[in-house]
Structures are given as structure tokens and as C-alpha cells.
């Protein structure tokens, strides 16, 4: 089907829904973009309690703040099972988690070799 030129001219780029991967969504490029207030609040809580080597928090809900992916490496996890590590993070974020739809949590024990980053 061929569209008439007048119809093609009336379609504006702002009405096109670009795939997320092409728009630089936070899901793919969060380290290059500023953190949302919620991401910053979560990061601050985790840094205060766990003093992590690595602490990455991403809003993976498309920006509505209902689902987060958290990747954290801390010395405070040394000697703890994976379940205990997750329970510790859940305890720190208990009040926040109650408002969320979901959480993707990755925890790792510190090797003591990595630079601090967030």
C-alpha cells in the first residue's frame, strides 16, 4: 500500500514510537544519564549501610519507579550466604520495596580489589 505524499508529510517524527534501544533509555545507558531521585535515594541508603565497592541502581520500569535492578558488591556480604545477602538488602530497603512492583537483585561478596564506584 502506497501512502499519498500529503499523508506522509502530515506524519511527524514526534508521533513515532521509537524502540527503547534507539532512544538511549535508562535500561541500556543508565551510567551515562543522571540518576532519578528514587535511584539516588536507594543508592544513598545502600552506600550508607553497606559501604559497597560497586552499587548500581537502575529504574527498569520505564521511569515510573515501580521496578528496580540493583547490583551491589560489598565486604559486608563476606561470610554470608546469597540468601542472607538478599535478606540484608531487603531489610535496608524494606519501606521502599513495599511500594515497588518488583526488584531484580544481584549481590556479590567483595574481593577487596575493585575501585569504589556507583
UniProtKB/Swiss-Prot annotation:
Keywords: Mitochondrion. The keyword rRNA processing does not apply. Its main location: mitochondrion. Disulfide bonds: none annotated. One of its GO terms (cellular component) is mitochondrial matrix. One of its GO terms (biological process) is protein maturation. InterPro entries: BolA, BolA-like_sf, Mt_Fe-S_assembly_factor. Disruption phenotype: Increases frequency of mitochondrial genome loss. Cells show a slight decrease of succinate dehydrogenase (SDH). Cells lacking BOL1 and BOL3 display defects in a subset of mitochondrial [4Fe-4S] enzymes. SUPFAM superfamilies: BolA-like. It comes from the Eukaryota. It is found in: Mitochondrion matrix. Interacts with NFU1. Belongs to the BolA/IbaG family. Acts as a mitochondrial iron-sulfur (Fe-S) cluster assembly factor that facilitates [4Fe-4S] cluster insertion into a subset of mitochondrial proteins such as lipoyl synthase (LS) and succinate dehydrogenase (SDH). Required during the last step of iron-sulfur protein assembly when the iron-sulfur cluster is inserted into the target protein. Acts together with NFU1, later than BOL1 and GRX5 in the [4Fe-4S] cluster insertion process. Not required for [2Fe-2S] cluster insertion into mitochondrial proteins. Present with 259 molecules/cell in log phase SD medium. This is BolA-like protein 3. It comes from Saccharomyces cerevisiae (strain ATCC 204508 / S288c). The lineage of its organism: Eukaryota, Fungi, Dikarya, Ascomycota, Saccharomycotina. The gene is BOL3.
